[in-house]
Design a protein with these regions (language model features):
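Short amphipathic alpha-helix with an adjacent loop that forms part of the alpha/beta core around
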Residues: 233-237
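Conserved redox-active cysteine motifs that mediate thiol-disulfide chemistry
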Residues: 238-239, 245-254
Length: 254
């Protein structure tokens, strides 16, 4: 259980480690997203104020405190960008639309600085924040939300390293799950913003894999036993109507 609470630290970093191990730092949770917008914002601000108060009371070295204040912001407000989506999910209120007050608050939390990409909390917060900000003023959900996110980045993010991180994250994730069909605009944006050799290599490997599954590409030949043990090959199916039933391994056929 709570054995970690009884640990005592020694040495030059004892005070810092004791602070980090107190467990008193609190953040927004998924459950908080069912709060109405104003109450949600107030709770987020209250948590952040309490976290800062605890940090200041610890009276730690300035260099650590300055970095920790930044980390605390993104740790505390981690769930903040998702409120519009999660509120609808939790309350079933499909009429909810985030207000300008919400977007103004979210915008105030966003700092675009590639030096912050060393912070896991920042790297997790930022994509969600950008995705949420790109929804401001959008009345109809686009066919591909990733294009909306990437276009927002292209227009608004001037820090090249931050733009690269975000575009790579969104485009790679989209093609990983949806393939190459209809992805020309995304690939164009990827090539515009992503220059890192490792990112490019990983992306090209992904595209090569999906190239085989593009619409119009001949299927690879195969031979598999049917439910009666008879071997069926792709060639045997030529000229026939094929019904494909896709189902999960843990359930019976639909």
């Amino acid at each position: 259980g709570a054995m970690w609470k009884t640990i005592n630290f020694d040495g030059a970093a004892a005070a810092v480690n004791t602070y980090l191990n107190t467990g008193k730092i609190k953040n927004l949770t998924f459950q908080d997203t069912k709060l109405k917008e104003d109450a949600f914002i107030n709770k987020a601000d209250s948590l952040f104020a309490a976290n800062n108060e605890g940090l200041n009371a610890a009276n730690l070295p300035t260099a650590f405190t300055d970095k920790e204040k930044i980390r605390l912001k993104y740790f505390t407000y981690g769930f903040f960008p998702m409120h519009p989506m999660y509120y609808v999910y939790q309350t079933k209120d499909s009429t909810h639309v985030a207000s300008n007050t919400f977007y103004n608050k979210l915008q105030s939390l966003i700092t675009i600085d590639s030096k912050l990409l060393t912070l896991p909390e920042y790297k997790e917060f930022l994509p969600n924040a950008i995705a949420s900000m790109s929804n401001q003023g959008v009345t109809e959900k686009p066919e591909n939300t990733t294009e909306q996110f990437v276009n927002y980045i292209d227009k608004n993010i001037k820090d090249k390293k931050v733009a690269e991180y975000l575009v790579n994250l969104f485009v790679y994730g989209n093609i990983s799950s949806r393939g190459l069909d209809g992805s020309d605009a995304l690939i164009s944006m990827f090539n515009k913003h992503v220059k890192d050799a490792k990112m490019l290599d990983k992306f090209n490997t992904l595209c090569t894999k999906w190239e085989k599954l593009k619409a119009g590409t001949p299927s690879p030949a195969f031979s598999y036993p049917d439910i009666n043990g008879k071997t069926i090959s792709l060639a045997d199916l030529k000229g026939k109507y094929i019904y494909i039933d896709v189902w999960a391994t843990w359930c019976g056929p639909c």
